[in-house]
UniProtKB/Swiss-Prot annotation:
Residue intervals passing through the bilayer: 36-56, 80-100
Region spans: Disordered: 126-148
Protein name listed in UniProt: Suppressor of tumorigenicity 7 protein-like
Source species taxonomy: Eukaryota, Metazoa, Chordata, Craniata, Vertebrata
Sorted UniProt keywords: Membrane, Transmembrane, Transmembrane helix
InterPro entries, sorted: ST7
PANTHER family (UniProt xref): SUPPRESSION OF TUMORIGENICITY 7 (PTHR12745), SUPPRESSOR OF TUMORIGENICITY 7 PROTEIN-LIKE (PTHR12745:SF4)
Topology of the protein relative to the lipid bilayer: Multi-pass membrane protein
Length: 555
């Protein structure tokens, strides 16, 4: 990766400087005094302990006691040392195994957590600096925590697959469940939000469907949908449920969605005529609007999967024009993917110009599509050797900066695009900047990167240069907010257990794991040497005890 490193440095030099961080407020004399005392406290305690030990050496008869201990150690046989070191090795090995398991499960050291949470307060440990309520540091921490909460919000995957026609077929073939209970529970909550309202009791079919969306068992949901159709043959949400969960092919799903569209349009027109009569009628209109938009969007996705891409693009454009307030559904991401399949790069740029705005939420689809378009202009002629000799051109610098911007937003995507990590079926919900979003993006967009000659090669040479600009991503970002620390936990809930969740930044192994591993290895080695060479190890043990006694007598 030497070429990639050089290109990354060139891009960083060409990039505009980041904004200077704000100046921290000066500490008062009390805070400075407290910090100084905290730094020298440990040294003072150590010196005081040595002085106390020296003063009490005669009353405590340290020399006589040490001589007695030496006689006792000299009387021990080599078998005792073998048993002692073997037991120590076993105990330290068990501690090491437990520490390693706890670190992989919770991402932190158990011994460090217990020390900080329980032992430190007992020993009188305090924070080096305490923020007063309303202080600038406290305000910054509150702002950061609020940003982390918004960044860790779970979003519905705009390109989510069909349960019956895709997820279930995967289960039939592999025997693995691609969706987690947490993910499906979020979908159930979405369905209740989109497809129900307070006036459902007025229509028996809607009452049945309200129970169906809350049902956990798929066969029970399908049975309830058929019951709703028996009560009302124009129940659009019943057709939606059957298309999502019972249809085993995209063709069957499209047929059911077309029936849902016919029923949904009729109900929507009826709700439009009555919307001003009461607040209940307005709630019905919002619900019927959600149902209609959902049906049309899924029909567009069916057309995209069946190869009728221009038809899918038309449906999506009409949806975005007819229902502009529903931008939170991220229909533009469906449109971007379809336009990339058509290789209509000018239209893709036009969509990005509207949605890649500083005031709008970002996504991996937005950032990486922008990087792909800039990469497309230089990737076919790009050569690392040539760029190292003559430097990067303006277009190449723009492409590298776009890649760095995308990687900073979601650092998990490149490994999937470069096929360094295997893909799985994307979940129904994603966490922005997390591994789940990276899987969802790469699952649909990998083919678009492969289609452009040299795009993946340029990505491979430059993407790791991003990490030099953000050495501490959890504390400070470059173009975005600091990377949220909650992504790993949320992604583990969203992604199936057979997938190895990508973690960023990579966690360092705690000190106590190294310590217990070294302790286990050293005691095992001592036990082995004592068993094989008892006389030599006995002489070594006596020498160590004599040296220790001499040092104490000297004190």
């Amino acid at each position: 990766m030497a070429d990639g490193d050089g290109l990354g440095e060139a891009a960083i030099a060409a990039a505009s400087p980041a904004s200077a961080p704000g100046l921290s407020p000066s500490l008062g004399w009390r805070e400075r005094l407290r910090a100084g005392l905290a730094g020298t406290g440990a040294s003072l305690w150590f010196v005081a302990g040595l002085g106390l030990l020296y003063a009490l050496r005669v009353p405590l008869r340290l020399c006589e006691n040490l001589a007695a201990v030496t006689v006792f150690l000299n009387s021990l046989t080599p078998k005792f040392y073998v048993a002692l070191t073997g037991t120590s090795s076993l105990i330290s090995g068990l501690i090491f195994i437990f520490e390693w398991w706890y670190f992989h499960k919770h991402g932190t050291s158990f011994i460090e957590q217990v020390s900080v949470s329980h032992l430190r307060p007992l020993m009188g440990g305090t924070e080096s600096s305490i923020s007063e309520p309303g202080s600038p540091s406290n305000n910054r921490e509150s702002e950061t925590s609020r940003q982390n909460l918004s960044e860790c919000k779970v979003w519905r995957n705009p390109l989510n697959l069909f349960r019956g026609a895709e997820y279930r077929r995967y289960t039939w073939v592999t025997g693995k469940e691609p969706l987690t209970y947490y993910d499906m529970n979020l979908s159930a909550q979405d369905h209740q939000t989109f497809f129900t309202c307070d006036t459902d009791f007025l229509r028996p079919s809607d009452t049945v469907m309200q129970k169906a969306w809350r049902e956990r068992n798929p066969p029970a949901r399908i049975k309830a949908a058929y019951q709703a159709l028996e009560l009302n043959n124009d129940c659009a949400t019943a057709y939606v449920l059957l298309a999502e969960e019972e249809a085993t092919t995209i063709v069957d799903a499209e047929r059911l969605f077309k029936q849902a569209l016919k029923a949904g349009e009729t109900i929507y027109r009826r709700s439009q005529q009555c919307q001003h009569q009461s607040p209940q009628h307005e709630a019905q209109l919002r619900r019927d609007t959600n149902v209609l938009v959902y049906i049309k969007r899924r029909l567009a996705m069916c057309a995209r999967k069946l190869g009728r891409i221009r038809e899918a693009v038309k449906i999506m454009r009409d949806l975005m024009k007819e229902f502009p307030p529903l931008t939170m559904l991220n229909i533009h991401e469906n449109l971007l993917e379809s336009l990339l399949e058509l290789q209509a790069y000018a239209d893709v740029q036009a969509v990005l110009a509207k949605y890649d705005d500083i005031s709008l939420p970002k996504s991996a689809a937005i950032c990486y599509t922008a990087a792909l378009l800039k990469t497309r202009t230089v990737s076919d002629k790009f050569s690392p050797e040539t760029a190292s000799r003559r430097g990067l051109s303006t277009a190449e610098i723009n492409a590298v900066e776009a890649i760095h911007r995308a990687v900073e937003f979601n650092p998990h995507v490149p490994k999937y695009l470069l096929e360094m990590k295997s893909l799985i079926l994307p979940p129904e919900h994603i966490l922005k900047r997390g591994d789940s979003e990276a899987i969802a993006y790469a699952f649909f967009h990998l083919q678009h990167w492969k289609r452009i000659e040299g795009a993946l090669h340029l990505l491979q040479c430059t993407w790791e240069g991003t990490f030099r600009m953000i050495p501490y991503p959890l504390e400070k970002g470059h173009l975005f907010y600091p990377y949220p620390s909650c992504t790993e936990t949320a992604d583990r809930e969203l992604l199936p257990s057979f997938h190895h969740v990508s973690v960023y930044p990579k966690k360092e192994i705690p000190f106590f794991i190294h310590f217990t591993a070294g302790l286990c290895s050293s005691t095992a080695m001592i036990a082995f040497l004592t068993h094989q060479f008892p006389e030599i190890m006995g002489v070594f043990a006596k020498a160590v005890s004599m040296i220790s006694r001499t040092c104490i007598e000297y004190l």
